[in-house]
Amino acid sequence: MVQSLELLLDEGSESALRGSWDALAAAGLPSLASHTSETNRPHVTVAAAEEGLDGALDAVRAVVAGWGLGTGGLAAVVGSPVLFGGAKQRWVLARQIVPSRPLLTLHAAVHRALSEHAPEAEVDPQTTPDGWTAHVTLSRRMPADRLAEALAVVDPEPIPFRFTGLRFWDSPSKTVTDL
């Protein structure tokens, strides 16, 4: 099971990304539209671990308090489609988040708080400052032979947006906590 810290997007960009989920599903392709849990929404994972992140929530909350996520947000841009993985000929299709100095600074600050206040958490190296590619997932387990079709369905136009919040996802309890 996994715990994660996830940046949330403004309503307009979330709607546009859900539109990509829906377009993939309408084309008969794997899509996160099929994941109908009320907690499922477009997000950018900034940290993930099997356990232990909950020990640093107060510290993370203090870090993000100064970033105005609840009052105007941090400006960012959803960029081009990107592919991850390829294990067993299955791919993750996502949209890259164009990295900016403020986003990278916030990400590093969250990880400093985690290392100081939850040192026992074994953070996934793909979410650490040295291994992170900021992205919003559109589809998991995309078959290799359908990649061209999927890329043709996804609108690649940049989407300017604002990060408006950070949440903690706890998969064992299937709960989210807004930070």
Annotated model-derived regions:
Residues 160-164, 169, 175-179:
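Glycine-rich, aromatic-bearing surface loops/beta-hairpins
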